[in-house]
């Protein structure tokens, strides 16, 4: 297997560190988007915006703004997949893992399983956006030409 290009090696420490890094990117960028939106509409920031499934929705202005923040966060996390994961084949895995841990966080925070249909819809859209755009960016990066220098090293 020495001749295989970019062969996959099982490295649990690398995978765990990438999971932690992507969770950090997810919550860090979501916090920035929510802070930006809250600053624009002069609203007070709250952890409920991140972890309460009842806040996301389309019928109220705060719900629409939170939904918009989650969608923008999916686009930001797609860039995180490009810079930190770098493998198109792993984008869906890391995207689902990030959102699974977010589901657990929401469940623990509110002490009930998220049952709002809009929360599930927003999460499904965000998973699709993050995975597809992240995979597109990673595959575009993987398919770049490898520059080869064909000039001789010396003319001796």
From Swiss-Prot:
The keyword Transport applies. This is Protein SYS1 homolog. It is found in: Golgi apparatus membrane. It is a multi-pass membrane protein. One of its GO terms (cellular component) is cytosol. The chain crosses the membrane at residues 13-33, 65-85, 91-111, 113-133. Interacts with ARFRP1.
């Amino acid at each position: 297997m020495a001749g295989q290009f970019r062969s996959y090696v099982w490295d649990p420490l690398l995978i765990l560190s990438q999971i932690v890094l992507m969770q950090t990117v997810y919550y860090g960028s979501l916090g920035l988007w929510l802070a930006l939106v809250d600053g624009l509409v002069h609203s007070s920031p709250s952890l409920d915006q991140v972890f309460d499934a009842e806040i996301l929705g389309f019928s109220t202005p705060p719900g629409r703004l939170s939904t918009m923040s989650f969608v923008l966060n999916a686009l930001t996390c797609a860039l995180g997949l490009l810079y930190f994961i770098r493998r198109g084949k792993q984008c869906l895995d890391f995207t689902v893992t990030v959102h699974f841990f977010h589901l657990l966080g929401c469940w623990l925070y509110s002490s009930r399983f998220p049952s709002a249909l809009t929360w599930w819809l927003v999460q499904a859209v965000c998973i699709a956006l993050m995975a597809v755009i992240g995979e597109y960016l990673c595959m575009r990066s993987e398919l770049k030409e490898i520059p080869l220098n064909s000039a001789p090293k010396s003319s001796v």
